[in-house]
Design a protein with these regions (language model features):
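Surface-exposed, charge/polar-rich loops and edge strands
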Residues: 1-402
């Protein structure tokens, strides 16, 4: 397919995958690196000597990146992981629970051509942390592998792409299945030229918005700049592993990322400067409309922006968002005071921190339309604004650059 620099371009690739049966495969997958705690990592290490956490997020003993590369090479040599003989795009059905309701999200694993944000083709919406990019770049240099996918969304309001995908896998058996806790995964490989061509042609009419994986995407751009000189236009280094999902998919869920603050003096002063406080009942949390809720010592207060609050430092595209107001008006001074700020998408876990004296800022989740509006305006939301649930596991579909 001729390359048009003004449209998104995806390509099939030969995935590296585990050869285990469904009853074992779930023990080998892990979450992406940025949601693995040290305790999670220890558990996953003990779960199997071949759990993908050893590659995705190795323990910091000695040279962790060399260790990850050595493990991956050894697994390939032993046949623990095998590369598919033919290139394909990979349909991934991910079933999970929201409360007691079972939900399915469908996405496509493919190779997505890299574009800088200013080209307006692959659109970021969130700022990143330099340290995380340094870590991912070191891993990419050592393994020469996209170990986990970026998560992108695209417009498909009329179901053109979703319908085409369904037709290609209808009545066929998945090539891989896995169960991880209450989540189920099924993967189909579409390797025929017509199926791949239909998906590429349909997606070429659309922008791709990065939902999750901004650090991995920027790392891939940095690696291309570092080592891509003289590479062919279709060289693997010019693409990144992506999991792409329709913005209208009923399984696309976005949670808020709440702020947990330890050290309250600067926070209280900032609140009183910019906001009015209104006590509310804890049971009303689920009904809260736009705003920020402060929780401390069992007390819940909803914040209302004062009429004379100066929002000139906040970009117009996102100054109405609670997360932007919290970051720009409240937490900037808190960080300068030396207080500790952590992030938690689970509301119950965030509230549990108040028992140890922390203050929690509960924030409303950002909807997909707002993300598109911010990205189309060329703006970036603060780090840790969104949490797309559930995460796409690492190890299910891996993309070597060799």
């Amino acid at each position: 397919m001729p390359q048009n620099p003004e449209v998104a371009d995806v390509a099939p690739f030969r995935a590296l995958r585990y050869g285990e049966q469904p009853e074992q495969l779930g023990d080998l997958l892990c979450p992406p690196y940025d949601v693995i705690s040290p305790e999670d990592r220890d558990r996953l290490y003990g779960q199997s000597p071949y759990n993908f956490v050893r590659v995705e997020f190795p323990k910091p003993d000695g040279d962790p990146y060399a260790s990850a590369a050595a493990d991956l090479a050894a697994w390939r040599l032993r046949g623990v992981m095998k590369q598919d003989a033919a290139a394909a795009i990979y349909v991934h059905d991910h079933e999970f629970l929201i409360g007691k309701t079972r939900v399915r999200r469908r996405g496509i694993h493919c190779a997505l051509r890299l574009h800088r944000p200013e080209e307006g083709i692959v659109m970021p919406h969130e700022l990143t942390f330099p340290k995380a990019k340094e870590d991912r770049l070191a891993l990419l240099r050592a393994t020469r592998t996209n170990t986990s996918a970026i998560f992108g969304v695209f417009e498909d309001a009329r179901g053109e792409i979703a319908g085409g995908i369904s037709r290609h896998i209808e009545g066929t058996k998945p090539t891989a299945e896995a169960t991880v806790g209450d989540e189920q995964h099924r993967v189909w490989a579409i390797g025929d030229r017509m199926g791949i061509g239909e998906f590429r042609e349909a997606l070429a009419k659309r922008r791709v918005y990065i939902a999750d994986g901004h650090h991995r995407y920027e790392t891939a751009l940095a690696y291309l700049a570092e080592r891509g000189a003289g590479a062919a236009a279709d060289a693997p280094i010019g693409y990144v592993l992506a999991y792409l999902c329709a913005a209208d998919d009923p399984g696309l869920r976005i949670f808020a990322t709440h702020r947990v603050v330890r050290g309250n003096g600067a926070l209280d002063r900032a609140i009183d400067r910019y906001f009015e406080r209104s006590p509310i009942d804890a049971g009303a949390i689920g009904d809260i409309q736009p705003g920020i809720v402060v929780v401390r010592d069992g007390r819940y207060e909803q914040l209302q922006l004062k009429a004379d609050a100066d929002l000139s430092s906040v970009k117009p595209a996102w100054r109405d968002l609670p997360v932007a107001q919290a970051e720009e008006l409240l937490l900037r001074d808190v960080r300068n005071s030396g207080a500790e700020i952590t992030y938690e998408h689970d509301t119950k876990a965030a509230l549990a921190a108040t028992e140890a004296g922390a203050t929690v800022l509960l924030l409303r989740a950002v909807d997909p339309e707002t993300l598109r509006r911010v990205a189309d305006a060329g703006e970036r939301l603060p780090q840790k604004t969104t949490y797309f649930f559930p995460k796409v596991p690492a190890g299910l579909v891996v993309r070597p650059l060799d």
